[in-house]
């Protein structure tokens, strides 16, 4: 009969493509609910890396995938996918998450932290000026007594 044709795309590859996305989603949800701060920097990075891995796996299906020019093209493709996905997901993250009510709480906390830092610096400068004033007020006078030699 004829020879068997190997499938170009193996369904087992989907496990390697989709499992990192699910793991990243669970990790980000865990971090979101366990920390008091909104970790918006991790979302674009994790999903950008996951999409980069997907493009790397999918680009292996090109014919003659190990040719020098095809490897260079795969490298450029992976970098472009990483950069575009990172910037697009970052923009979407900013639009969705930073407009939420929770982000306002975080922003108010950061502003409060800045005010506390400024107040503590002001208190330190007040203490320093007070200490300098007290130091300038005190005059140290030392009087040395001469010992009288006794003649016996």
From Swiss-Prot:
Annotated source species: Mycoplasma pneumoniae (strain ATCC 29342 / M129 / Subtype 1) (Mycoplasmoides pneumoniae)
Keywords: Cell membrane, Membrane, Transmembrane, Transmembrane helix
Location within or outside the cell: Cell membrane
Entry annotated with the keyword Ion transport: no
Transmembrane segments: 13-33, 38-58, 69-89
The keyword Membrane appears for this protein: yes
Primary subcellular site in the record, as a coarse category: membrane
A GO cellular component entry from the record: plasma membrane
Membrane topology of this protein: Multi-pass membrane protein
Name of the protein: Uncharacterized protein MG384.1 homolog
